[in-house]
Amino acid sequence: DASPYYHSCFSKDNAITYCHFPSTKYHIDSENIDYLKTDLGMTERSNVFSDNKDYVDINNPKNCKTKPQFSRRKEYFEILKYGYWNLMRNSTLITNSEFSRRAIVNAFGSDNIYVLSPPIDIETFRNVALMANGDDETNDIILVISRIAPHKKIENAIKLAKILKDNNVSKGMKIVGNLYYYFFDYYSELKQMVLDLGLTDYLTFEINASLDKLLSIIRESRVYFHPMIGEHFGMAVLEAMAAGLIPVVPNEGGLTEFVPQEYQFNTIEQAAEIIMHVFTHLPKTERIKISNDINKFSNSHYIEGFQTILNELLSRRRK
């Protein structure tokens, strides 16, 4: 639904819309320019030819204004609003968690919504990471996987790192995530925060890492920390759990539907206490149990769930 498309022939019997979370509604209602830029990829180009008419690569992010001003903003949002509202009202809705389902109900007043969690490549993370782990003593990294974006609240991870370093917990923290050019300023702020808190020897960033690189870091890790409060689902958390990492997550959002309560925190200080306990008292068998607990998020389970929804739609059409 983040890039809404609507056709007049759509109905709840012949169209399915996956709604991750009703964020698009609020972006459109508030006429959020950043939504046009980051979600829809719309930018107002700078001059694409230099004074001497030399060709300039218009696909180079450096040649785009970082804060576009759209002269036809009202028109864009009217079109989006028409398409989005009709799409949501005239299709069968699927979302990723009960947390997201409740948010959609509050936004649209419709309660006929299916919950189908996205599939996780469990075997890749379980076989390559968990089964390859050696002695627990060598796996002391705290891992964060997140896009480098302001709403992901990466600063919470940095605050946690400060507490853990001061208490001599873990060998360090690694933050792995993709970075897009329009969040370069935020990334610079995070790096400055690391410098100011004296964490350059404890916390490192791995930007735009490959899957092989990510799996290599997972092999070094024991705990996964999730910094964002109110996460809608959290695929990275499940991938880490598949690899046998202990998840430490906020006690609000879709994550609470599958992360054991003893690993949920309300404050950064509580998160630090949980991690200290994991490092000093938790046996390796608990990591294996965590990995085995997420089989319901497999590809095969997702396919079965989606087929069930399709069969219900087809049976309605036959009536």
Feature map (PLM): residue ranges:
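A conserved mid-protein helix/loop that constitutes part of the nucleotide-sugar donor-binding site
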Residues: 140, 149-166, 185-186
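Membrane-proximal helix-turn-helix segments that form the acceptor-binding/catalytic region
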Residues: 35-93
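A charged, aromatic-enriched C-terminal amphipathic alpha-helix characteristic of glycosyltransferases
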Residues: 280-317
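Acidic anion/phosphate-binding donor-loop and adjacent secondary structure
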Residues: 27-28, 105, 111-114, 120-137, ...
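Nucleotide-activated donor-binding/catalytic signature segment of Leloir-type glycosyltransferases, i.e.
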Residues: 187-209
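Carbohydrate-associated surface elements
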Residues: 99, 119
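Aromatic "clamp/platform" in nucleotide-sugar-dependent glycosyltransferases that forms part
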Residues: 229
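Short hydrophobic beta-strand element within catalytic cores of glycosyltransferases
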Residues: 237, 245-249
